[in-house]
A protein has these predicted regions:
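Metallocofactor- and cofactor-centric catalytic cores in central/energy metabolism, strongly enriched
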Residues: 1-77, 82-100, 106-144
Length: 144
């Protein structure tokens, strides 16, 4: 995992649990690296074990692309997915969404970078994810 990504994701799950009563929070790690698409088997496992999902973190070109493609794979199977990307990859995200046939997928957008930030900056990103992920899941998020 990228430096601070785990802190951001676990912090986001904790922050979201203040508003949402999760019966369980699951974490998945791709065996072949975070910049690859999830395998069909992993997608099916996620679908079977979750009602809503964060896919993350799109903070480089390949990571952004796989984050969006994973979210689309989950959305196609009926699981609301909130892909988390950074400000540097907003345009790439728009292009990817259109190219793979889901232009209306709304991402969560946090400040770039992710790796070289302070604990206070981690908390700022967690706060943004808490707010925007709920907007995505409820269909209230405006496009980027």
């Amino acid at each position: 995992s990228k430096w601070n990504a785990n802190k951001i994701l676990r912090g986001s799950a904790s922050a979201l649990s203040q508003d949402i009563k999760f019966s369980k929070v699951n974490y998945y790690v791709k065996k072949h690296g975070f910049s690859t698409d999830a395998t069909i088997e992993m997608i099916e496992e996620i679908v079977n074990d979750n009602d809503i999902v964060l896919t993350a973190i799109g903070d480089c070109g390949s990571c952004c692309s796989s984050c969006i493609r994973d979210a689309v794979a989950l959305e196609d199977r009926g699981i609301p997915a909130a892909p988390v990307i950074t400000t540097e990859f907003v345009n790439e995200t728009k292009l990817t969404r259109v190219a793979i046939g889901m232009p209306d997928l709304k991402p969560v957008v946090i400040d770039h970078p992710v790796s070289s930030i302070t604990n206070d900056e981690v908390l700022e990103r967690v706060k943004i994810i808490k707010e925007q992920a709920q907007e995505v899941w409820l269909g209230q998020r405006q496009d980027i």
